[in-house]
Amino acid sequence: MNQERLLQVILAPIVSEKSTMIAEKNQQVAFRVAKDATKPEIKAAVEMLFNVKVDGVSTVNVKGKVKRFGRTIGRRSDWKKAYVSLVDGQELDLTATPAAAE
């Protein structure tokens, strides 16, 4: 897999009440990923970016909601969510700030 492609797979971490509970209970982390990303690509991207070992990947295609803007009806885009399970003993803290260089 191409390193440039792996950098485009992970779009953003999902920080919500549900994803936080899953992270604490099951050692899983939720990410918003590219619509055309495959499970092996997601696994390789997480291992490369965060230097952790991945046990498995589950994906969900989330349908966009229909929203109204006054009289106009619009629709949000569909997107893909990935739940990444980490190997026992591995930890991924997305809220930590990088250490400042002294």
Curated annotation (Swiss-Prot):
<comment type="subunit">
    <text>Part of the 50S ribosomal subunit. Contacts protein L29, and trigger factor when it is bound to the ribosome.</text>
</comment>
<keyword id="KW-0689">Ribosomal protein</keyword>
<comment type="function">
    <text>One of the early assembly proteins it binds 23S rRNA. One of the proteins that surrounds the polypeptide exit tunnel on the outside of the ribosome. Forms the main docking site for trigger factor binding to the ribosome.</text>
</comment>
<dbReference type="GO" id="GO:0003735">
    <property type="term" value="F:structural constituent of ribosome"/>
</dbReference>
<dbReference type="GO" id="GO:0006412">
    <property type="term" value="P:translation"/>
</dbReference>
<comment type="similarity">
    <text>Belongs to the universal ribosomal protein uL23 family.</text>
</comment>
<dbReference type="InterPro" id="IPR012678">
    <property type="entry name" value="Ribosomal_uL23/eL15/eS24_sf"/>
</dbReference>
<dbReference type="GO" id="GO:0019843">
    <property type="term" value="F:rRNA binding"/>
</dbReference>
<dbReference type="GO" id="GO:1990904">
    <property type="term" value="C:ribonucleoprotein complex"/>
</dbReference>
<dbReference type="GO" id="GO:0005840">
    <property type="term" value="C:ribosome"/>
</dbReference>
<dbReference type="InterPro" id="IPR013025">
    <property type="entry name" value="Ribosomal_uL23-like"/>
</dbReference>
<keyword id="KW-0687">Ribonucleoprotein</keyword>
<protein>
    <recommendedName>
        <fullName>Large ribosomal subunit protein uL23</fullName>
    </recommendedName>
</protein>
<dbReference type="InterPro" id="IPR012677">
    <property type="entry name" value="Nucleotide-bd_a/b_plait_sf"/>
</dbReference>
<dbReference type="Pfam" id="PF00276">
    <property type="entry name" value="Ribosomal_L23"/>
</dbReference>
<keyword id="KW-0694">RNA-binding</keyword>
<keyword id="KW-0699">rRNA-binding</keyword>
